[in-house]
């Protein structure tokens, strides 16, 4: 089926499908979690983050309204580096769809490009070979492919190939991944998210997308690859801020010495 526009309902079902694929693979994502620290919780953190969005997002005809609800839920439910990066990306999309009820392939590609930029800007020290790289290179593929077709189904399927290639290359970009011969866990999660969307477009059934209750998810898998190492900042800390009276750069400067992976 050809899909020439993306509205709120289509986005909602696409997101639910992508989230289900990530959640279904949380144990494997935990197992290969080595960067930024080998704490074996990327899958669990993303499963919790996406489960909150899945349960709290509003399915509306308007793309902007649906994204507004997703962005709010993502920020409040985000856990861990990858969870917060996902939340940043969703909010980047929310900001850049220009209050539209629906958008074309061309406008979607532009919104994704801006959303990726927004995500990078929120990170104090962005590192390549991670979920960020796959997001960026997937976005670049959308820019290339949008001129060939106005069909979202074709765009998503072809761009998934670029994202998959980018994922495979993460093990060549970070020494810790190359040593263990695994890809980046967060990057793998993003590709799984895209695979879930493409799978739904091709073979999906709305009856299969029933929202499930958020279950208790263990933080570690039994067979994780993690190595023995000293972790200076062992725990993630998230804070939801409203009505800031200072600019983002100043806030970053004030809290930059409180950890080694800052995302605002």
Label each region the model flagged.
Residues 1-264:
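N-terminal loops that bind phosphate or other acidic moieties
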């Amino acid at each position: 089926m050809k899909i020439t526009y993306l509205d709120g309902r289509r986005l909602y079902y696409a997101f639910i499908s992508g989230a289900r694929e990530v959640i279904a693979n949380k144990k494997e994502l935990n197992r290969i979690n080595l960067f930024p620290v080998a704490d074996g919780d990327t899958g669990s953190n993303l499963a919790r983050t996406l489960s909150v969005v899945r349960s709290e997002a509003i399915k509306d005809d308007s793309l902007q309204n649906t994204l507004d609800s997703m962005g709010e839920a993502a920020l409040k439910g985000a856990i861990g580096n990858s969870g917060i990066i996902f939340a940043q990306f969703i909010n980047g999309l929310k900001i850049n769809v220009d209050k539209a009820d629906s958008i074309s392939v061309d406008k979607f590609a532009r919104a994704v490009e801006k959303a990726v930029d927004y995500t990078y800007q929120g990170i104090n020290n962005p590192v390549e070979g991670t979920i960020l790289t796959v997001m960026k290179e997937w976005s670049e593929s959308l820019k290339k492919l949008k001129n060939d077709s106005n069909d979202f189904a074709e765009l998503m399927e072809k761009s998934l190939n670029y994202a998959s290639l980018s994922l495979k290359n993460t093990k060549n970009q970070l020494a810790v991944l190359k040593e263990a011969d695994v890809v980046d866990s967060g990057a793998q999660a993003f590709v799984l998210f895209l695979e879930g969307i493409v799978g739904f477009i091709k073979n999906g059934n709305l009856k299969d997308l029933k929202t499930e209750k958020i279950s208790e998810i263990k933080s570690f898998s039994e067979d994780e690859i993690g190595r023995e190492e000293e972790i200076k900042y062992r725990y993630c800390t998230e804070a939801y801020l409203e009505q800031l009276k200072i600019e983002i750069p100043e806030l970053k400067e004030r809290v930059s010495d409180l950890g080694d992976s800052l995302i605002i």
